[in-house]
């Protein structure tokens, strides 16, 4: 899907190079030299691997778990077809979901919340957990230890755009469609970095994969 480097699609190559080699606090480069000798030219944007070559099988993850890779190899050796799960992370997460469904009335970052309730769904506690939009390949390791999912395994096969799916889930949890007193812009204002939150690992594979100039 492009991974974390894909967030570079929010800037031009020139902006990235200037920030990395000239403007960064740790860089001493008074002449403003951009390294270029024997350095390959950067493409205009990061692309998912599927746009660069034909893919027979993609095992997602950043990085993929060793047991998932091992099982994939064993499946091939048995002459069987590898099938990735179509379920999302919430379906395997051990945390308790409210009987009436997920609901939010605030968004908090983890340091603002403090220590989450040990067994309750993180979304209902105000944390943006990417579980609803992420494929269930990791065993919900992060939510199990009270860290919200960041979406590093990418979407399920049923989802075209991981970030869009999560934005829809947040809007639903807030009751934006049902409660007309909830202002969508007010909800969005509670997120300091919308793209970085919803597309940390998949921006290059999104329906809109880069900042439009």
Which residues does each predicted region cover?
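Iron-sulfur (Fe-S) cluster-binding modules
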Residues: 3-59, 63-213
């Amino acid at each position: 899907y492009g991974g974390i480097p894909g967030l570079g699609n929010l800037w031009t190559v020139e902006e990235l190079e200037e920030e990395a080699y000239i403007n960064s606090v740790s860089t001493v480069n008074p002449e403003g030299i951009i390294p270029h000798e024997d350095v390959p030219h950067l493409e205009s944007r990061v692309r998912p691997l599927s746009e660069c070559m034909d893919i027979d099988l993609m095992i997602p993850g950043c990085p993929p778990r060793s047991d998932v890779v091992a099982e994939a190899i064993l499946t091939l050796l048995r002459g069987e077809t590898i099938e990735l799960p179509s379920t999302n992370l919430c379906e395997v997460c051990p945390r308790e979901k409210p009987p009436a469904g997920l609901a939010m009335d605030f968004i908090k970052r983890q340091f603002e919340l403090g220590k989450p309730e040990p067994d309750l769904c993180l979304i209902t506690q105000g944390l943006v957990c990417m579980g609803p939009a992420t494929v269930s390949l990791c065993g919900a390791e992060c939510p199990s230890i009270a860290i919200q999912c960041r979406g590093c395994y990418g979407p399920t096969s049923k989802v075209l755009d991981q970030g869009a799916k999560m934005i829809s889930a947040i809007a639903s949890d807030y009751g934006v469609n049902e409660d007309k007193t909830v202002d969508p812009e007010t909800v969005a204002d509670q997120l300091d970095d919308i793209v970085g939150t919803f597309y940390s690992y998949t921006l290059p594979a999104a329906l809109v994969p880069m900042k439009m100039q």
